[in-house]
From Swiss-Prot:
Pathway: Amino-acid biosynthesis; L-leucine biosynthesis; L-leucine from 3-methyl-2-oxobutanoate: step 1/4
Residues noted as binding Mn(2+) in the record, renumbered to the chain: 14, 202, 204, 238
Recorded GO CC terms: cytosol
Catalysed conversion reaction: 3-methyl-2-oxobutanoate + acetyl-CoA + H2O = (2S)-2-isopropylmalate + CoA + H(+)
HAMAP family: LeuA_type1
Ranges of residues in domain Pyruvate carboxyltransferase: 5-267
Family note: Belongs to the alpha-IPM synthase/homocitrate synthase family. LeuA type 1 subfamily.
Pfam short name (any one): HMGL-like
Intracellular or extracellular location(s): Cytoplasm
Keywords: Amino-acid biosynthesis, Branched-chain amino acid biosynthesis, Cytoplasm, Leucine biosynthesis, Manganese, Metal-binding, Transferase
Protein name: 2-isopropylmalate synthase
Length: 524
Protein backbone atom coordinates (compact mmCIF):
# COMPACT_ATOMS: atom_id res chain seq x y z
CA UNK A 1 0.00 0.00 0.00
CA UNK A 2 1.36 3.42 -0.95
CA UNK A 3 2.25 5.99 1.70
CA UNK A 4 0.82 9.51 1.80
CA UNK A 5 2.93 12.54 1.00
CA UNK A 6 1.64 15.47 3.06
CA UNK A 7 1.15 18.64 1.01
CA UNK A 8 2.19 21.74 2.95
CA UNK A 9 1.22 24.96 1.18
CA UNK A 10 3.01 28.20 2.04
CA UNK A 11 1.51 30.45 -0.65
CA UNK A 12 0.15 32.83 2.00
CA UNK A 13 3.47 33.08 3.85
CA UNK A 14 6.52 32.37 1.68
CA UNK A 15 4.63 33.05 -1.54
CA UNK A 16 3.34 36.43 -0.39
CA UNK A 17 6.90 37.60 0.20
CA UNK A 18 7.27 37.89 -3.59
CA UNK A 19 4.37 40.31 -3.99
CA UNK A 20 4.83 44.03 -4.53
CA UNK A 21 1.77 44.72 -2.39
CA UNK A 22 0.45 42.68 0.54
CA UNK A 23 -2.80 40.80 0.16
CA UNK A 24 -5.81 42.04 2.10
CA UNK A 25 -7.35 39.81 4.76
CA UNK A 26 -10.30 39.18 2.43
CA UNK A 27 -7.98 38.11 -0.39
CA UNK A 28 -6.04 35.82 1.93
CA UNK A 29 -9.28 34.18 3.05
CA UNK A 30 -10.27 33.61 -0.59
CA UNK A 31 -6.97 31.86 -1.27
CA UNK A 32 -7.15 29.86 1.96
CA UNK A 33 -10.65 28.62 1.13
CA UNK A 34 -9.48 27.62 -2.36
CA UNK A 35 -6.53 25.72 -0.87
CA UNK A 36 -8.89 23.95 1.51
CA UNK A 37 -11.14 22.91 -1.39
CA UNK A 38 -8.06 21.61 -3.19
CA UNK A 39 -7.31 19.47 -0.15
CA UNK A 40 -3.94 20.70 1.09
CA UNK A 41 -3.09 18.99 4.38
CA UNK A 42 -1.34 21.97 5.98
CA UNK A 43 -1.45 25.65 5.02
CA UNK A 44 1.09 28.08 6.41
CA UNK A 45 -0.81 31.36 6.42
CA UNK A 46 1.58 33.89 7.92
CA UNK A 47 4.22 35.04 10.37
CA UNK A 48 2.02 36.32 13.24
CA UNK A 49 4.66 38.29 15.15
CA UNK A 50 5.77 40.23 12.07
CA UNK A 51 2.92 42.76 12.16
CA UNK A 52 -0.56 43.34 13.63
CA UNK A 53 -1.97 42.84 10.13
CA UNK A 54 -0.35 39.43 9.77
CA UNK A 55 -1.57 38.42 13.24
CA UNK A 56 -5.12 39.42 12.30
CA UNK A 57 -5.07 37.55 9.00
CA UNK A 58 -3.64 34.38 10.58
CA UNK A 59 -6.25 34.49 13.34
CA UNK A 60 -9.10 35.16 10.89
CA UNK A 61 -8.08 32.31 8.59
CA UNK A 62 -7.61 30.01 11.59
CA UNK A 63 -11.27 30.59 12.49
CA UNK A 64 -12.50 29.90 8.95
CA UNK A 65 -10.58 26.77 7.94
CA UNK A 66 -12.04 23.46 9.10
CA UNK A 67 -10.51 20.69 6.98
CA UNK A 68 -6.84 21.71 6.67
CA UNK A 69 -4.33 22.22 9.46
CA UNK A 70 -3.41 25.90 9.85
CA UNK A 71 0.23 26.76 10.49
CA UNK A 72 2.06 29.88 11.63
CA UNK A 73 5.76 30.63 11.38
CA UNK A 74 7.98 31.64 14.32
CA UNK A 75 11.66 32.23 14.86
CA UNK A 76 13.34 30.51 17.80
CA UNK A 77 12.31 33.47 19.92
CA UNK A 78 9.93 33.15 22.88
CA UNK A 79 7.74 36.07 21.80
CA UNK A 80 7.39 34.72 18.26
CA UNK A 81 6.20 31.35 19.54
CA UNK A 82 3.78 32.84 22.07
CA UNK A 83 2.24 35.21 19.52
CA UNK A 84 1.90 32.43 16.95
CA UNK A 85 0.11 30.25 19.48
CA UNK A 86 -2.25 33.10 20.37
CA UNK A 87 -3.16 33.66 16.71
CA UNK A 88 -3.62 29.96 15.97
CA UNK A 89 -5.41 28.69 19.06
CA UNK A 90 -8.87 29.38 17.54
CA UNK A 91 -8.21 26.86 14.75
CA UNK A 92 -9.74 23.40 14.53
CA UNK A 93 -6.18 22.05 14.19
CA UNK A 94 -2.96 24.03 14.11
CA UNK A 95 0.80 23.71 13.86
CA UNK A 96 3.60 25.96 15.08
CA UNK A 97 6.54 26.07 12.71
CA UNK A 98 9.80 27.22 14.29
CA UNK A 99 12.95 27.73 12.28
CA UNK A 100 16.62 28.43 12.89
CA UNK A 101 19.66 28.70 10.63
CA UNK A 102 22.03 25.72 10.83
CA UNK A 103 24.61 26.32 8.09
CA UNK A 104 28.05 27.50 9.14
CA UNK A 105 27.70 30.60 6.95
CA UNK A 106 24.41 31.65 8.56
CA UNK A 107 25.49 30.81 12.10
CA UNK A 108 28.71 32.81 11.88
CA UNK A 109 27.70 35.76 9.70
CA UNK A 110 24.00 36.17 10.53
CA UNK A 111 23.42 34.77 14.02
CA UNK A 112 27.00 35.32 15.26
CA UNK A 113 26.72 32.35 17.61
CA UNK A 114 28.36 28.97 18.02
CA UNK A 115 26.76 25.77 16.74
CA UNK A 116 26.25 24.57 20.34
CA UNK A 117 24.33 27.77 21.12
CA UNK A 118 22.16 27.23 18.05
CA UNK A 119 21.52 23.65 19.13
CA UNK A 120 20.36 24.84 22.55
CA UNK A 121 18.10 27.51 21.00
CA UNK A 122 16.45 24.87 18.82
CA UNK A 123 15.80 22.53 21.75
CA UNK A 124 14.41 25.29 23.96
CA UNK A 125 12.11 26.66 21.23
CA UNK A 126 10.69 23.30 20.22
CA UNK A 127 9.90 22.56 23.87
CA UNK A 128 8.21 25.95 24.26
CA UNK A 129 6.06 25.37 21.17
CA UNK A 130 5.08 21.93 22.50
CA UNK A 131 3.50 23.69 25.49
CA UNK A 132 0.85 24.95 23.07
CA UNK A 133 0.38 22.05 20.64
CA UNK A 134 1.43 18.48 19.92
CA UNK A 135 2.09 19.47 16.29
CA UNK A 136 5.44 21.26 16.07
CA UNK A 137 7.60 21.58 12.98
CA UNK A 138 11.27 22.51 13.16
CA UNK A 139 13.12 23.85 10.11
CA UNK A 140 16.89 23.81 9.66
CA UNK A 141 17.29 26.98 7.60
CA UNK A 142 19.88 26.59 4.83
CA UNK A 143 20.03 22.84 5.45
CA UNK A 144 21.33 22.36 1.91
CA UNK A 145 24.62 24.03 2.91
CA UNK A 146 24.79 22.68 6.47
CA UNK A 147 27.62 20.21 7.25
CA UNK A 148 25.93 16.81 7.38
CA UNK A 149 27.28 15.97 10.86
CA UNK A 150 25.78 19.18 12.28
CA UNK A 151 22.52 18.60 10.42
CA UNK A 152 22.18 15.11 11.90
CA UNK A 153 22.86 16.46 15.42
CA UNK A 154 20.27 19.24 15.24
CA UNK A 155 17.63 16.96 13.70
CA UNK A 156 18.11 14.37 16.45
CA UNK A 157 17.98 17.05 19.16
CA UNK A 158 14.83 18.68 17.75
CA UNK A 159 13.03 15.33 17.61
CA UNK A 160 14.04 14.56 21.20
CA UNK A 161 12.68 17.97 22.20
CA UNK A 162 9.28 17.11 20.71
CA UNK A 163 9.29 18.15 17.04
CA UNK A 164 6.90 15.96 15.06
CA UNK A 165 7.96 17.25 11.65
CA UNK A 166 11.54 18.04 10.64
CA UNK A 167 11.85 20.31 7.63
CA UNK A 168 14.97 20.26 5.45
CA UNK A 169 14.99 23.44 3.34
CA UNK A 170 17.19 24.14 0.37
CA UNK A 171 16.83 27.80 1.27
CA UNK A 172 18.86 29.26 -1.58
CA UNK A 173 18.18 26.60 -4.20
CA UNK A 174 21.81 25.46 -4.17
CA UNK A 175 21.63 21.68 -4.22
CA UNK A 176 21.07 19.26 -7.09
CA UNK A 177 18.52 16.40 -7.01
CA UNK A 178 21.16 13.71 -6.45
CA UNK A 179 22.77 15.73 -3.68
CA UNK A 180 19.49 16.65 -2.00
CA UNK A 181 18.13 13.12 -2.14
CA UNK A 182 21.42 11.99 -0.61
CA UNK A 183 20.93 14.36 2.34
CA UNK A 184 17.54 12.78 3.09
CA UNK A 185 18.99 9.27 2.78
CA UNK A 186 21.81 10.17 5.18
CA UNK A 187 19.35 11.50 7.77
CA UNK A 188 17.42 8.23 7.66
CA UNK A 189 20.67 6.27 7.98
CA UNK A 190 22.33 8.27 10.76
CA UNK A 191 19.65 9.86 12.97
CA UNK A 192 18.59 7.18 15.49
CA UNK A 193 15.16 8.67 16.32
CA UNK A 194 14.25 9.66 12.75
CA UNK A 195 11.24 7.33 12.78
CA UNK A 196 9.57 9.54 15.40
CA UNK A 197 9.10 12.47 13.00
CA UNK A 198 7.99 13.15 9.45
CA UNK A 199 10.75 14.42 7.19
CA UNK A 200 9.68 17.43 5.15
CA UNK A 201 11.43 19.37 2.37
CA UNK A 202 11.17 23.00 1.33
CA UNK A 203 13.06 23.83 -1.88
CA UNK A 204 13.71 27.10 -3.67
CA UNK A 205 14.14 27.45 -7.40
CA UNK A 206 17.25 29.60 -7.81
CA UNK A 207 18.83 27.05 -10.16
CA UNK A 208 15.51 25.77 -11.50
CA UNK A 209 15.69 22.51 -9.53
CA UNK A 210 13.11 22.97 -6.76
CA UNK A 211 10.65 20.41 -8.14
CA UNK A 212 13.43 17.97 -9.07
CA UNK A 213 14.93 18.25 -5.59
CA UNK A 214 11.52 17.71 -3.98
CA UNK A 215 10.82 14.60 -6.05
CA UNK A 216 14.29 13.23 -5.27
CA UNK A 217 13.60 13.79 -1.57
CA UNK A 218 10.27 11.95 -1.77
CA UNK A 219 12.00 9.02 -3.47
CA UNK A 220 14.54 9.06 -0.62
CA UNK A 221 11.79 8.90 2.03
CA UNK A 222 10.56 12.46 2.69
CA UNK A 223 6.83 12.40 3.38
CA UNK A 224 5.97 16.09 3.36
CA UNK A 225 6.60 18.56 0.53
CA UNK A 226 6.35 22.30 1.06
CA UNK A 227 5.76 24.77 -1.74
CA UNK A 228 3.41 27.28 -3.29
CA UNK A 229 0.81 27.37 -6.04
CA UNK A 230 2.39 28.48 -9.33
CA UNK A 231 5.78 28.38 -7.59
CA UNK A 232 5.55 31.99 -6.40
CA UNK A 233 8.00 33.14 -3.77
CA UNK A 234 11.12 35.15 -3.07
CA UNK A 235 13.77 35.49 -5.78
CA UNK A 236 13.16 32.67 -8.30
CA UNK A 237 10.30 31.24 -6.25
CA UNK A 238 9.45 28.02 -4.44
CA UNK A 239 8.60 24.48 -5.41
CA UNK A 240 5.48 24.50 -7.61
CA UNK A 241 3.12 22.30 -5.65
CA UNK A 242 0.93 21.55 -8.66
CA UNK A 243 3.97 20.11 -10.45
CA UNK A 244 4.96 17.87 -7.54
CA UNK A 245 1.37 16.72 -7.02
CA UNK A 246 0.90 15.77 -10.67
CA UNK A 247 4.35 14.16 -10.90
CA UNK A 248 3.38 11.91 -7.99
CA UNK A 249 0.07 11.07 -9.67
CA UNK A 250 1.40 10.52 -13.18
CA UNK A 251 4.55 8.61 -12.20
CA UNK A 252 2.98 6.02 -9.92
CA UNK A 253 5.12 3.48 -11.74
CA UNK A 254 8.25 4.72 -9.94
CA UNK A 255 6.81 6.38 -6.82
CA UNK A 256 4.75 4.24 -4.49
CA UNK A 257 3.21 7.28 -2.78
CA UNK A 258 0.06 9.38 -3.10
CA UNK A 259 -1.42 12.69 -1.98
CA UNK A 260 -4.90 13.50 -0.70
CA UNK A 261 -5.29 16.40 -3.13
CA UNK A 262 -8.50 16.97 -5.08
CA UNK A 263 -6.76 17.20 -8.45
CA UNK A 264 -9.75 18.72 -10.23
CA UNK A 265 -9.37 21.87 -8.11
CA UNK A 266 -5.76 22.49 -9.18
CA UNK A 267 -6.43 24.72 -12.18
CA UNK A 268 -9.10 26.81 -10.48
CA UNK A 269 -6.92 27.34 -7.40
CA UNK A 270 -3.96 28.27 -9.58
CA UNK A 271 -6.06 30.89 -11.36
CA UNK A 272 -7.33 32.35 -8.07
CA UNK A 273 -3.77 32.69 -6.76
CA UNK A 274 -2.60 34.25 -10.02
CA UNK A 275 -5.39 36.81 -10.14
CA UNK A 276 -5.38 37.84 -6.48
CA UNK A 277 -1.58 38.00 -6.32
CA UNK A 278 -1.42 39.82 -9.67
CA UNK A 279 1.21 37.37 -10.90
CA UNK A 280 0.43 36.12 -14.43
CA UNK A 281 1.18 32.47 -15.16
CA UNK A 282 3.71 31.97 -17.99
CA UNK A 283 2.08 30.33 -21.01
CA UNK A 284 4.62 27.49 -20.94
CA UNK A 285 4.23 26.82 -17.20
CA UNK A 286 3.93 23.09 -16.56
CA UNK A 287 0.45 21.83 -15.57
CA UNK A 288 -1.36 25.21 -15.38
CA UNK A 289 0.10 27.35 -18.21
CA UNK A 290 -2.17 28.21 -21.13
CA UNK A 291 0.05 26.14 -23.44
CA UNK A 292 0.37 23.15 -21.10
CA UNK A 293 -2.17 21.16 -23.14
CA UNK A 294 -1.92 23.12 -26.40
CA UNK A 295 -0.86 21.48 -29.66
CA UNK A 296 -0.07 23.61 -32.70
CA UNK A 297 2.17 21.35 -34.78
CA UNK A 298 0.24 19.59 -37.51
CA UNK A 299 1.95 16.27 -36.73
CA UNK A 300 1.13 16.59 -33.04
CA UNK A 301 -2.46 17.64 -33.72
CA UNK A 302 -2.98 14.64 -35.98
CA UNK A 303 -1.54 12.37 -33.30
CA UNK A 304 -3.75 13.86 -30.59
CA UNK A 305 -6.87 13.48 -32.74
CA UNK A 306 -6.06 9.80 -33.18
CA UNK A 307 -5.22 9.23 -29.51
CA UNK A 308 -4.61 11.99 -26.97
CA UNK A 309 -2.06 9.82 -25.17
CA UNK A 310 0.24 10.18 -28.17
CA UNK A 311 1.23 13.63 -26.92
CA UNK A 312 -0.46 14.03 -23.51
CA UNK A 313 0.78 12.25 -20.38
CA UNK A 314 -2.24 13.49 -18.41
CA UNK A 315 -5.66 14.75 -19.42
CA UNK A 316 -6.64 18.41 -18.90
CA UNK A 317 -9.78 17.19 -17.14
CA UNK A 318 -7.58 15.74 -14.38
CA UNK A 319 -6.71 19.23 -13.14
CA UNK A 320 -10.21 20.63 -13.66
CA UNK A 321 -9.93 21.91 -17.22
CA UNK A 322 -12.60 21.21 -19.78
CA UNK A 323 -11.51 19.61 -23.02
CA UNK A 324 -8.81 21.80 -24.57
CA UNK A 325 -9.25 22.61 -28.25
CA UNK A 326 -6.36 22.47 -30.67
CA UNK A 327 -4.81 25.84 -31.52
CA UNK A 328 -5.31 26.46 -35.22
CA UNK A 329 -2.18 28.11 -36.66
CA UNK A 330 -0.26 28.02 -39.93
CA UNK A 331 1.33 24.78 -38.67
CA UNK A 332 -2.03 23.00 -38.36
CA UNK A 333 -2.92 20.32 -40.87
CA UNK A 334 -6.10 19.56 -42.80
CA UNK A 335 -7.16 17.02 -40.17
CA UNK A 336 -7.21 19.69 -37.44
CA UNK A 337 -9.27 22.09 -39.59
CA UNK A 338 -11.72 19.34 -40.49
CA UNK A 339 -11.96 18.29 -36.82
CA UNK A 340 -12.76 21.86 -35.75
CA UNK A 341 -15.47 22.20 -38.40
CA UNK A 342 -16.97 18.90 -37.24
CA UNK A 343 -16.87 20.23 -33.67
CA UNK A 344 -19.02 23.15 -34.80
CA UNK A 345 -21.55 20.74 -36.32
CA UNK A 346 -20.58 20.92 -40.01
CA UNK A 347 -20.28 17.95 -42.32
CA UNK A 348 -17.71 17.84 -45.11
CA UNK A 349 -20.42 18.19 -47.75
CA UNK A 350 -21.37 21.57 -46.22
CA UNK A 351 -18.15 23.17 -47.44
CA UNK A 352 -15.14 22.56 -49.69
CA UNK A 353 -12.27 21.38 -47.48
CA UNK A 354 -9.60 22.02 -50.12
CA UNK A 355 -10.68 25.62 -50.62
CA UNK A 356 -11.17 26.16 -46.90
CA UNK A 357 -7.73 24.85 -46.01
CA UNK A 358 -6.02 26.99 -48.66
CA UNK A 359 -7.82 30.11 -47.39
CA UNK A 360 -7.11 29.09 -43.79
CA UNK A 361 -3.35 28.94 -44.40
CA UNK A 362 -3.35 32.43 -45.95
CA UNK A 363 -5.24 33.85 -42.99
CA UNK A 364 -3.15 31.98 -40.40
CA UNK A 365 0.05 33.36 -41.93
CA UNK A 366 -1.32 36.87 -41.41
CA UNK A 367 -2.97 36.73 -37.98
CA UNK A 368 -1.40 33.76 -36.18
CA UNK A 369 -4.20 31.94 -34.36
CA UNK A 370 -7.45 31.31 -36.22
CA UNK A 371 -10.73 31.02 -34.29
CA UNK A 372 -14.02 29.25 -35.00
CA UNK A 373 -15.73 32.35 -36.38
CA UNK A 374 -12.77 32.90 -38.71
CA UNK A 375 -13.17 29.39 -40.11
CA UNK A 376 -16.89 29.92 -40.69
CA UNK A 377 -16.23 33.17 -42.51
CA UNK A 378 -13.66 31.45 -44.72
CA UNK A 379 -15.95 28.49 -45.39
CA UNK A 380 -19.10 30.39 -46.28
CA UNK A 381 -18.26 33.94 -47.34
CA UNK A 382 -14.47 33.72 -47.80
CA UNK A 383 -13.86 36.95 -45.88
CA UNK A 384 -10.18 37.71 -45.48
CA UNK A 385 -8.39 40.03 -43.07
CA UNK A 386 -7.31 42.39 -45.85
CA UNK A 387 -10.93 43.24 -46.77
CA UNK A 388 -12.25 46.56 -45.39
CA UNK A 389 -13.57 46.28 -41.85
CA UNK A 390 -17.24 47.07 -41.27
CA UNK A 391 -16.49 48.95 -38.03
CA UNK A 392 -13.63 51.40 -37.54
CA UNK A 393 -12.81 53.87 -34.77
CA UNK A 394 -13.04 57.50 -35.92
CA UNK A 395 -12.38 59.21 -32.59
CA UNK A 396 -12.93 58.99 -28.86
CA UNK A 397 -12.51 61.34 -25.92
CA UNK A 398 -12.75 60.70 -22.20
CA UNK A 399 -13.09 62.75 -19.06
CA UNK A 400 -12.29 61.16 -15.71
CA UNK A 401 -10.82 61.95 -12.34
CA UNK A 402 -10.95 61.14 -8.65
CA UNK A 403 -14.01 63.32 -8.04
CA UNK A 404 -15.98 62.92 -11.29
CA UNK A 405 -17.62 59.98 -13.02
CA UNK A 406 -15.79 58.84 -16.14
CA UNK A 407 -17.49 59.99 -19.34
CA UNK A 408 -16.62 58.98 -22.89
CA UNK A 409 -17.65 60.15 -26.35
CA UNK A 410 -17.05 57.72 -29.21
CA UNK A 411 -17.59 57.96 -32.95
CA UNK A 412 -17.55 54.81 -35.08
CA UNK A 413 -17.74 54.35 -38.82
CA UNK A 414 -20.24 51.53 -39.34
CA UNK A 415 -20.16 50.55 -42.98
CA UNK A 416 -21.33 53.67 -44.82
CA UNK A 417 -22.63 55.40 -41.69
CA UNK A 418 -21.03 57.48 -38.96
CA UNK A 419 -22.48 57.05 -35.47
CA UNK A 420 -21.55 58.77 -32.22
CA UNK A 421 -22.64 58.27 -28.63
CA UNK A 422 -21.60 59.30 -25.13
CA UNK A 423 -21.81 57.28 -21.92
CA UNK A 424 -20.58 57.11 -18.35
CA UNK A 425 -18.82 54.15 -16.80
CA UNK A 426 -16.75 52.73 -13.98
CA UNK A 427 -13.53 54.26 -15.28
CA UNK A 428 -12.55 55.53 -18.75
CA UNK A 429 -12.31 52.11 -20.42
CA UNK A 430 -15.74 51.06 -19.19
CA UNK A 431 -17.18 54.41 -20.31
CA UNK A 432 -15.77 53.88 -23.83
CA UNK A 433 -17.22 50.36 -23.92
CA UNK A 434 -20.63 51.60 -22.76
CA UNK A 435 -20.63 54.23 -25.53
CA UNK A 436 -19.69 51.61 -28.14
CA UNK A 437 -22.50 49.35 -26.91
CA UNK A 438 -24.96 52.20 -27.37
CA UNK A 439 -23.79 52.67 -30.95
CA UNK A 440 -24.02 49.02 -31.96
CA UNK A 441 -26.82 47.78 -29.74
CA UNK A 442 -24.94 44.49 -29.39
CA UNK A 443 -25.61 42.75 -26.02
CA UNK A 444 -21.91 42.21 -25.33
CA UNK A 445 -20.58 40.88 -22.02
CA UNK A 446 -16.87 41.36 -21.28
CA UNK A 447 -15.44 38.01 -20.12
CA UNK A 448 -11.70 38.70 -20.06
CA UNK A 449 -9.53 41.82 -20.19
CA UNK A 450 -5.74 41.59 -20.21
CA UNK A 451 -3.23 44.41 -20.54
CA UNK A 452 0.38 43.66 -21.51
CA UNK A 453 3.21 46.17 -21.86
CA UNK A 454 5.13 45.94 -25.13
CA UNK A 455 8.49 47.63 -24.66
CA UNK A 456 9.78 49.86 -21.87
CA UNK A 457 9.72 53.51 -20.90
CA UNK A 458 7.38 56.31 -21.89
CA UNK A 459 6.95 55.06 -25.46
CA UNK A 460 5.96 51.52 -24.46
CA UNK A 461 2.89 50.17 -26.20
CA UNK A 462 -0.01 48.72 -24.27
CA UNK A 463 -1.60 45.63 -25.82
CA UNK A 464 -5.14 44.88 -24.72
CA UNK A 465 -6.55 41.39 -25.31
CA UNK A 466 -10.24 40.89 -24.61
CA UNK A 467 -12.77 38.09 -24.83
CA UNK A 468 -16.48 38.89 -24.96
CA UNK A 469 -19.62 36.79 -24.89
CA UNK A 470 -22.23 37.54 -27.54
CA UNK A 471 -25.33 35.39 -28.07
CA UNK A 472 -23.69 32.44 -26.36
CA UNK A 473 -20.44 32.59 -28.36
CA UNK A 474 -17.06 34.01 -27.43
CA UNK A 475 -15.19 36.47 -29.59
CA UNK A 476 -11.60 37.70 -29.26
CA UNK A 477 -10.15 41.12 -29.91
CA UNK A 478 -6.77 42.80 -29.61
CA UNK A 479 -5.72 46.46 -29.66
CA UNK A 480 -2.30 48.11 -29.55
CA UNK A 481 -1.49 51.75 -28.75
CA UNK A 482 0.61 53.87 -26.41
CA UNK A 483 -2.64 54.97 -24.73
CA UNK A 484 -4.38 52.23 -22.73
CA UNK A 485 -7.88 53.60 -23.39
CA UNK A 486 -7.17 53.74 -27.13
CA UNK A 487 -5.83 50.17 -27.22
CA UNK A 488 -8.92 49.08 -25.26
CA UNK A 489 -11.20 50.79 -27.78
CA UNK A 490 -9.33 49.20 -30.70
CA UNK A 491 -9.69 45.77 -29.10
CA UNK A 492 -13.46 46.22 -28.84
CA UNK A 493 -13.69 47.39 -32.47
CA UNK A 494 -11.76 44.25 -33.44
CA UNK A 495 -14.38 42.21 -31.57
CA UNK A 496 -17.21 44.05 -33.33
CA UNK A 497 -15.79 43.16 -36.73
CA UNK A 498 -15.49 39.51 -35.74
CA UNK A 499 -19.13 39.55 -34.58
CA UNK A 500 -20.21 41.28 -37.79
CA UNK A 501 -18.45 38.65 -39.91
CA UNK A 502 -20.16 35.88 -37.94
CA UNK A 503 -23.51 37.56 -38.68
CA UNK A 504 -22.70 37.59 -42.40
CA UNK A 505 -21.88 33.89 -42.14
CA UNK A 506 -25.29 33.19 -40.62
CA UNK A 507 -27.01 35.16 -43.38
CA UNK A 508 -25.07 33.28 -46.05
CA UNK A 509 -25.85 29.93 -44.44
CA UNK A 510 -29.55 30.82 -44.37
CA UNK A 511 -29.38 31.88 -48.03
CA UNK A 512 -27.70 28.62 -49.01
CA UNK A 513 -30.24 26.63 -47.02
CA UNK A 514 -33.16 28.46 -48.66
CA UNK A 515 -31.61 27.97 -52.09
CA UNK A 516 -31.13 24.27 -51.42
CA UNK A 517 -34.73 23.98 -50.18
CA UNK A 518 -35.99 25.80 -53.27
CA UNK A 519 -34.00 23.53 -55.60
CA UNK A 520 -35.40 20.47 -53.85
CA UNK A 521 -38.96 21.75 -54.34
CA UNK A 522 -38.33 22.43 -58.03
CA UNK A 523 -36.94 18.91 -58.43
CA UNK A 524 -40.07 17.46 -56.85
Amino acid sequence: MSQQVIIFDTTLRDGEQALQASLSVKEKIQIAMALERMGVDVMEVGFPVSSPGDFESVQTIARQIKNSRVCGLARCVDKDIDVAAEALRVAEAFRIHVFLATSTLHIESKLKRSFDEVLEMAIRSVKRARNYTDDVEFSCEDAGRTPIDNLCRVVEAAINAGATTINIPDTVGYTTPNQFGGIITTLYDRVPNIDKAIISVHCHDDLGMAVGNSIAAVQAGARQVEGTLNGIGERAGNTSLEEVIMAIKVRQDIMNVHTNINHQEIFRTSQIVSQLCNMPIPANKAIVGSNAFAHSSGIHQDGVLKNRENYEIMSPQTIGLKDVQLNLTSRSGRAAVKHRMEGMGYKEQDYNLDNLYAAFLKLADKKGQVFDYDLEALAFINKQQEEPEHFSLDYFSVQSGSSIMATASVKLICGEEEKAEAATGNGPVDAVYQAINRITGYPIELVKYQLTAKGQGRDALGQVDIVVSYNGRRFHGVGLATDIVESSAKAMVHVLNNIWRSQQVEKEKQRLQQSKHQNNQETV
